[in-house]
Design a protein with these regions (language model features):
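Structured, active/binding-site neighborhoods that engage oxygen-rich ligands
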Residues: 1-186
Length: 186
């Protein structure tokens, strides 16, 4: 159902800035190709590990906060319709976990959030970079963090999610400061 809704919205507004591969699979889904097939066919049959699933999953984590299994399962389900590659799904899981943790721990510490996310994110490159984020001092400059973790310029989970979560951990109490740190890391 979610894939169908994405495809319908795409056909209503195809020039909204979708990524190249999103054009490919959303068009295919709209033409009747099953989403499971369409999303796996991109990138030489490996599926996307872009950061789109991670960008939209925050509310899933907040909604299911308190139920770790549900947060993880629902994050994967929301990701798989557009991101068949395990790294794209891992990024969504990590962001959902961070949102769940933050909604349960409004006065929590950034390092504790990163530890929680790291412990529960699937094994892979996204998780490896989250481990680097945890090891990096929250007092480091955003430019240093971006040099180590990536800054999202590659538009993939592996280099977007760890940096974004490091910025969030660094400024848990201030959305504005977290966003400025993210921009400073370019």
């Amino acid at each position: 159902e979610l894939a169908r809704l994405f495809a319908e919205e795409y056909h209503r507004t195809p020039i909204r800035g979708y990524g190249t591969m999103a054009h490919t699979y959303l068009h295919a889904i709209g033409q009747g190709t099953p989403w499971q097939q369409a999303t796996r066919e991109v990138f030489d049959g490996k599926g996307s590990f872009g950061n789109g699933a991670a960008m939209r999953v925050g509310p899933v984590g907040a909604y299911f906060a308190g139920d770790l299994k549900k947060v993880t399962d629902e994050a994967i389900q929301s990701a798989v319709v557009t991101h068949a590659h395990p790294e794209g799904q891992a990024g969504a899981v990590a962001v959902a976990l961070a949102a769940a943790w933050a909604s349960e721990n409004p006065k929590g510490e950034g390092k504790a959030m990163l530890e929680f996310v790291l412990m529960n994110t699937p094994v892979g490159e996204t998780r490896d970079n989250l481990e680097r984020a945890l090891d990096l001092s929250l007092e480091s400059r955003p430019q240093e963090a971006a040099a180590l973790l990536g800054s999202g310029q590659r538009i993939i989970s592996q280099d977007t999610v760890p940096f974004a979560l490091w910025c969030a951990a660094r400024h848990l109490g201030s959305l504005s400061e977290a966003l400025w740190a993210t921009v400073a890391g370019e």
